Amino acid sequence: MAKMHTKRKGKSSSTRPNRTEPPEWCKIGADEVTTITLDLWKQGVSTSEIGMILRDRYGVPDAKLVTGKKITTILKENNVAPNLPEDLTNLIVKALGLRKHLSTNKKDVHNKRALNLTESKIRRLVKYYKQEKVLPRDWFYKPETAEMMITR
């Protein structure tokens, strides 16, 4: 769960059902899900968007239930996985946008705070990914070189 940077309590959301096998009405097979996933990835669709497309267009409630593997695992097995996790990439893109905004609007204190909070999230996430050995031990976030990391 993410750190709350506010006094509010957050909002409730629904929980996913406890299932170990796909529902009977899901007629698509594991091979089809794998090929669809790889095709969508080649078109430039992110992993979270692949999951939503599988859900909305193909009626697959959860790719892991059908294939037994997560979408990123499918991509890793086919040697096309991204070098950075998607949530970290999204936070870095957000921080880059805030930095660009602050370069022209130097007195925008609210977005200075937003940048500070976003970069704190990035540092916490990097620390987690280093512990889980997703990122190498010598990897660290530098705002100056962040744009080059994202475009690679």
From Swiss-Prot:
PROSITE patterns: RIBOSOMAL_S15. One of its GO terms (cellular component) is cytosolic small ribosomal subunit. InterPro entries: Ribosomal_uS15, Ribosomal_uS15_arc_euk, Ribosomal_uS15_N, uS15_NS1_RNA-bd_sf. The keyword Transmembrane does not apply. GO terms for molecular function: small ribosomal subunit rRNA binding; structural constituent of ribosome. Residues 1-24 are annotated as: Disordered. Pfam families: Ribosomal_S13_N, Ribosomal_S15. Residues 1-11 have a biased composition (Basic residues). One of its GO terms (biological process) is translation. HAMAP family: Ribosomal_uS15_A. Part of the 30S ribosomal subunit. Belongs to the universal ribosomal protein uS15 family. This is Small ribosomal subunit protein uS15. The lineage of its organism: Archaea, Methanobacteriati, Methanobacteriota, Stenosarchaea group, Methanomicrobia.
